[in-house]
Amino acid sequence: MTAILITGYRSFEIGIFDHKDPRVSIIKQAIRKDLIGYLENGVDWFIFTGNLGFEQWALEVANELKEEYPLQIATIFLFETHGDKWNEKNQEVLSQFKAVDFVKYYFPNYEQPTQFSQYYQFLLEKTEGAYVFYDTENETNLKYFLKKAKDMPHYQLLLLTFDRLNDMSQS
């Protein structure tokens, strides 16, 4: 079994507030290409954390690819309360993250800041690599996860960057 964690920018972090934004289709093209590459190299599990934005778009692509490839999808939420306060539209997305092959809640609820690092350590230990939409030019809290991932020997990291997206949009 080979599992890849999929995470990246949330939609608000890159200024995408509408699913019909033309940038979403370019991002999804890149996701499709990269996920197919993973599947053709033996990956059989895609792991999500349940965030809006990149993960949401990658989940949509992964669900489409299930028709062609034998893959499994899991969502491992940080807290059981994840998304409880989202609006109705986003609740629909949350239900998609819960309608996968495996769902787990790492903690019942928030108690202390160390839960975040424990959660990311768990994800790193349970996956062989990560596919991350991230660019050092636009830093977010993902930088802490990426630092941990880069420090792990043999952990495979594939970054989808703004430069790669620009190249794809021009071709």
Curated annotation (Swiss-Prot):
Pfam families: YpsA. HAMAP family: UPF0398. Belongs to the UPF0398 family. This is UPF0398 protein SpyM50438.
